[in-house]
Amino acid sequence: MTHSLKALFALLFLYTAAVNAGVIGIFNALPPPNTKPINGESPLYQCDILDKQLVEIKEVNLDPNPPVRGENLTISANGEVFETIEEGAYIDVEVRLGYIRLLSQTFDLCETLEDNDIEGLSCPIEPGEYNIKKIVEIPGEVPPGKYVVVARAYTEKDDLITCLTGEVIFPPR
């Protein structure tokens, strides 16, 4: 039986929370500087790749890709955690619509794991290889628009866990 990639999953759940809040949907990314595409059927990019990161995200798959309003989205991912991630870890999320900042918020990574019942996972997150799978609902009311999302996770000591980014589009109906 495989373990879940807890840190990655928390970041993906922030993506899910943003979807549920109606601020993001389809990724249509032009890669920002210092990024690399994440393998799989996902338009996510790992950002801040010149900095040491405690998680290597190997693959992310979204089904359907791109996500569809009013339908379930299955998120599958795998990767590796290199160092223990403990209570106090956090995620900074920023969502922009063009030059307008819609959201700039910090979330507790461990609380995010618990609140979303991610296969019963909780901190501390031990080093190792992990696979995850989660199904989330995308509301039909998501407004059209083009958004840029950046999520950076840090340890309680402010070491970079990982960074995810993507440009997101919900077309008009």
Swiss-Prot record:
Subcellular locations according to the entry: Vacuole
Gene3D superfamilies per UniProt: Ganglioside GM2 activator
Superkingdom field: Eukaryota
CDD domains: PG-PI_TP
Keywords assigned: Lipid transport, Signal, Transport, Vacuole
Main location: other
Molecular function terms, GO-annotated: phosphatidylcholine binding; phosphatidylinositol binding; phosphatidylserine binding; sterol binding
Family affiliation: Belongs to the NPC2 family.
Extra information: Present with 2836 molecules/cell in log phase SD medium.
Protein's recorded name: Phosphatidylglycerol/phosphatidylinositol transfer protein
Native source species: Saccharomyces cerevisiae (strain ATCC 204508 / S288c) (Baker's yeast)
Gene: NPC2
